UniProtKB/Swiss-Prot annotation:
The UniProt record lists the keyword Nucleotide-binding: no
The name this protein goes by in its record: Diaminopimelate epimerase
Subunit relationships: Homodimer.
Species in which this protein is naturally found: Acinetobacter baumannii (strain ATCC 17978 / DSM 105126 / CIP 53.77 / LMG 1025 / NCDC KC755 / 5377)
GO cellular component: cytosol
Length: 281
């Protein structure tokens, strides 16, 4: 069967977006892995699925699958692309939409020239909300790694779990070595996204993220939210912060006790069609 899709990206964090309202398809783990292959498939960090909502207050249901086929709760760069996609495909004429995710409701607002502002919901910090194994809540936790190496982390759930550590320079940070150890650490029973943040000043940080089930990506929207909120909680950052990632910049806003707002661009790369039979086992 032929499957129509759109390739999009948010700051280089790239997606295959599929409308399963107007067409039908079954995409299992192995099929998603084959589609994600950058040599033999479409190639992407995440697959984004548009479905009818299960709850009356939502306009759409938004499902996210990593390149390894695992389904995750949230993707910040993805929800911006999702919002642009449903509007450009005329699935809605709204510019403010309500989207159901595994993590709850998010509310993207479409702006000009592909920019989207998203209400990302409330951050969570308690260990059981991440989830993270700890005897009691603390401002920072020490994580033991291989070769007697320890790092200090904050933990934040932005619809998906994040560990944030501050580094002197993101360019020299050992993301490839430390990232997988943090992602798969036994204290994170559902694995975790590992963020490495360099504070430039109180309104500007640089960030690299090793994403759960993907590896390091050019940008991570929920990771940017988690890092900014972590810095704000520590008193290091103002309430509105520019987060600089390899793929570009996001603006993150947060007030204690309120929702997190993320603003950033989207890019529509191309529309495609493929014969799904070649990717199914």
């Amino acid at each position: 069967m032929l499957l129509e899709f759109t390739k999009m990206h948010g700051l280089g964090n790239d997606f295959m977006v599929v409308d399963l309202i107007s067409q039908r398809a079954y995409l299992d783990t192995a099929t998603i892995q084959r589609l994600a292959d950058r040599h033999f498939g479409v190639g992407f960090d995440q697959l984004l699925i548009v479905e009818p909502p299960d709850v009356p207050e939502a306009d759409f249901k938004y499902r996210i699958f990593n390149a390894d086929g695992s389904e995750v709760e949230q993707c910040g760069n993805g929800v911006r692309c999702f919002a642009r996609f449903v509007h450009e495909r005329h699935l809605t004429n709204k510019t403010n939409i309500t989207v159901q995710t595994k993590a709850g409701i998010v509310k993207p607002e479409l702006g000009q020239n592909g920019w989207v502002r998203v209400n990302m919901g409330y951050p969570k910090f308690l260990p059981n909300e991440i989830p993270f194994v700890a005897d009691e809540p603390e401002a920072l936790y020490t994580l033991e790694l291989a070769n007697d190496q320890n790092i200090s982390i904050d933990v934040v759930n932005m619809g998906n779990p994040h560990a944030v550590t501050i580094v002197p320079d993101v360019l020299t940070a050992d993301v490839a070595g430390i990232g997988p150890q943090v992602e798969l650490h036994k204290r994170f029973p559902e694995r975790v996204n590992a963020g490495f943040m360099q504070v430039i000043d109180d309104k500007h940080v640089r960030l690299r993220v090793f994403e759960r089930g993907v590896g390091e990506t050019l940008a991570c929207g929920t990771g940017a939210c988690a890092a900014a909120v972590s810095g704000m909680r520590r008193g290091l950052l103002a309430n509105s912060v520019e987060v600089e990632l390899a793929g570009g910049k996001l603006q993150i806003e947060w007030q204690e006790g309120d929702v997190v707002w993320m603003t950033g661009p989207t890019t529509h790369v191309y529309d495609g069609r493929l014969d799904l039979r070649y990717f199914q086992g």
